[in-house]
């Protein structure tokens, strides 16, 4: 139905708009387009987040070990106060980023989880079984390795640190090697990392909590109930969810449960169904295209939306219908994703990665039990857990390898699973109050992530040639 207008000799709506854009484009606009287009293309690349995070990490380590290192580290301890009226909240910049801004990170993680569970790789047990089993092994074995090195004392609380995989770094490396690996491997690692994130969220909720305030928990439960009512009632506007999400964060902040979990809980209440079905949108699109052609053919046609209200109405209706065919979950994920990738996570790295190698005594620090436990857990624990649990799942018939993926590919992914970084750094802040133990954990995370990335890249580069599909 939508193609009939093209067959009848009418120019498609997209071609008309592109032609008018080229006609009306000024020379300066074209110049800015040539300058900004490469930058915009970079921001849209899958690897961009990992590249920015890597650059931020290097700059943070340089700053922390420079002549201004002490001032740089003290900067994050400054106190800030914000609120409305008598409702005031005071915290350090460090806590504002870790407890506040990182809630947006967990919100995006929750949105990704819900999407994958609804329509993605985790939507059916047959597809989800292998990455879920692999993620389980990649959490259990590293925790056991760490606990074997640190079975007693305060250091034992860090067992959750090596359980997480950083999806930005790991998937970014696979994308760089995409010409040497089957496409199914990237999908497998993405599903594994998302299942891994779910496990990390559960660990934080169940084991890294402070003294529980039942009153605050009760208030948070009431807010969560209201969010669920909004979802069931078909409310798709973002503002009510945003307001209640802030109240949920404040309640959890005073409850003893880590406040960033508000992001995950909020994400699971965001509607996943669009207001307008695709078939209805297609019909509306054809109607708008016909209306646009009729307007363009009118004798009094004015090629300027500011002085042509009918043309402006068509454009506004098209924009409104385009929003309606997207679910609130999609819109929120697309809007928040770049902010989290390029603002929140780099700020988190600036705030948490800084290590003064002189104070920690680098060589001695590498031999500390916490550093060794984290490093061994991430590098060898992740590799062993992911590979062994995957083998068990396939042997028992519970899961299956993705199309064209062979065991040599999966072993490369198992090495990349040792890139912990963001979530591991976050858990280390919850596990230890002692600054020295936090520094040792950071050193272990950075060392393990670097080793895992190097081993995984080398393994997949030399052993990751694409498998030929089996003949029928």
Curated annotation (Swiss-Prot):
Q: Where in the cell is it found?
A: Cell inner membrane
Give me the reactions it catalyses. Answer: Na(+)(in) + 2 H(+)(out) = Na(+)(out) + 2 H(+)(in)
Record keyword Transmembrane present:
yes
- GO cellular-component terms in the record? plasma membrane
- What are the disulphide bonds in this sequence? none
- Membrane topology qualifier: Multi-pass membrane protein
GO biological process terms, semicolon-separated:
regulation of pH
Q: Which GO terms describe its molecular function?
A: sodium:proton antiporter activity
In its keyword annotation, does this UniProt entry include Nucleotide-binding? no
Its keywords, alphabetically, are: Antiport, Cell inner membrane, Cell membrane, Ion transport, Membrane, Sodium, Sodium transport, Transmembrane, Transmembrane helix, Transport
Q: Which positions, given as ranges, span the membrane?
A: 48-68, 91-111, 129-149, 157-177, 185-205, 210-230, 237-257, 337-357, 374-394, 410-430, 443-463
Family stated for the protein in its record: Belongs to the NhaA Na(+)/H(+) (TC 2.A.33) antiporter family.
HAMAP family the record matches: NhaA
Q: What does this protein do?
A: Na(+)/H(+) antiporter that extrudes sodium in exchange for external protons.
- This one is known as Na(+)/H(+) antiporter NhaA
Gene that specifies this protein:
nhaA
